[in-house]
Design a protein with these regions (language model features):
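Outer-membrane beta-barrel signature, preferentially recognizing the C-terminal barrel domain
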Residues: 84, 190-198, 246-249, 277-331
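Outer-membrane beta-barrel translocator domains and adjoining extracellular loop/strand segments
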Residues: 2-12, 58-74, 118-128, 174-183, ...
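Face-selective signature of the C-terminal outer-membrane beta-barrel domain
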Residues: 28-56, 80-232, 263, 267-268
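Periplasmic-side early beta-strands and strand-to-turn transitions of outer-membrane beta-barrels
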Residues: 1-39, 53-70
Length: 335
């Protein structure tokens, strides 16, 4: 059971009190197949295939909602929501190679990920004491794919190890949301796609001199995220007409990181500085607005930007005593 008490401020002060009984029931099945082959002590390869599917998944809630405007109750109704999740598979293929040629160590990883999700939702609203009633049916499907590759070369330089490498990731997600009724108080149909490519190159160096450890690295990323509002085939030539530049993004950034560990008497000091990025998920970027009840919609925001974080950390240790201090600075935070 769940109770929600929400207050909305505007021209009208609105209070929405809701009591929920939530029910869910799902069955999942999965399978995997893989192999690993060692040629010799310097070369090995392997791959795995995994599939997941939910043959049965149902959910929903029963709720009683009371609505108050400027201190007076204006509406009371029940909402019986039933959701049937579509039985669509998720597939994941991964492969790797690990080897050594001379003094150079080679690590390669690749992945192909395919996912299909969807649900059909029924919302039956019944007004109390002669209030209006209605039944809303909506349908949502999402198809996504991703393929990625990462290569790292490691070899000794002076008294440490130098690593250089690159990564490439390309992904796409297509969303389709339809609702059986249209009106000024109902969301409309949405059909959008987001395609993103990420090309990265990085270098790092780590060494140990007596009791001092130093690790430093630099990563460069070129990210292109294109947003399309379309009902057509993404790969068709006509699809360029549906490109939305205001909701698309391009990034070119460097991400440095430095870590230094050294003793101070009987204590051990570690200092870290790094820059990281957190990008919105596909669901957060979707323009789809899902209808849950006449007062609750759920959706994303295609205008969200990536959040960049600059962080400094200090760790001081002495026997069982540990002291931590962290400083963070966020650029374009998303909460």
């Amino acid at each position: 059971n769940q109770h929600n008490d929400n207050r909305l401020y505007g021209k009208t002060l609105m209070n929405i009190n809701e009591d929920l009984i939530i029910k869910n029931k799902s069955y999942y099945t999965s399978g995997s197949l893989g192999f690993n082959y060692v040629f010799n002590d310097k070369h090995s390869v392997g791959a795995t295939y995994e599939v997941n599917i939910n043959p049965y998944s149902r959910g929903g809630w029963n709720s009683l909602m009371d609505v108050w405007k400027n201190g007076s109750q204006t509406e009371s109704y029940t909402n019986d929501m039933y959701c049937r999740f579509k039985s669509r598979p998720t597939q994941d293929i991964t492969a790797y190679y690990a080897g050594q040629i001379g003094k150079v160590s080679i690590e390669w990883n690749g992945e192909i990920y395919l996912r299909k999700t969807g649900q059909t939702q029924y919302s039956e609203e019944t007004g109390m004491e002669g209030g209006d009633s209605r039944t809303i049916e909506s349908d949502f499907t999402a198809d996504s794919w991703m393929h990625a590759s990462k290569l790292v070369l490691s070899f000794p330089v002076w008294k440490g190890t130098l690593k250089i490498g690159n990564e490439f990731t390309e992904s796409c997600r297509a969303n389709l949301y339809t609702i059986d009724e249209q009106g000024t108080d109902l969301p409309g149909k949405t059909d959008d796609q987001v395609k993103e490519s990420n090309l990265a190159a990085f270098v790092s160096y780590g060494l140990r001199l007596n009791k001092v450890e130093l690790n430093a690295g630099l990563r460069y990323e070129h990210v292109s995220s294109n947003y399309y509002n379309t009902g057509g085939d993404y790969w068709s030539e006509e699809n360029k007409d549906y490109f939305v530049p205001d909701q698309s993004r391009k990034y070119d950034h460097f991400f440095p990181n430095v870590s230094l560990t050294f003793p101070i008497g009987n204590m051990k000091m570690n200092m870290v500085y790094k820059v990281t990025v957190s990008r919105p998920s596909y669901s957060q970027l979707s323009s789809n607005v899902q209808y849950n009840s006449r007062y609750y919609y759920q959706g994303g925001n295609p205008l969200l930007k990536s959040t960049f974080e600059h962080g400094i950390g200090i760790n001081l240790g002495y026997k069982w005593f540990q002291f931590f201090a962290n400083w963070r600075y966020l650029v374009d935070p998303c909460y």
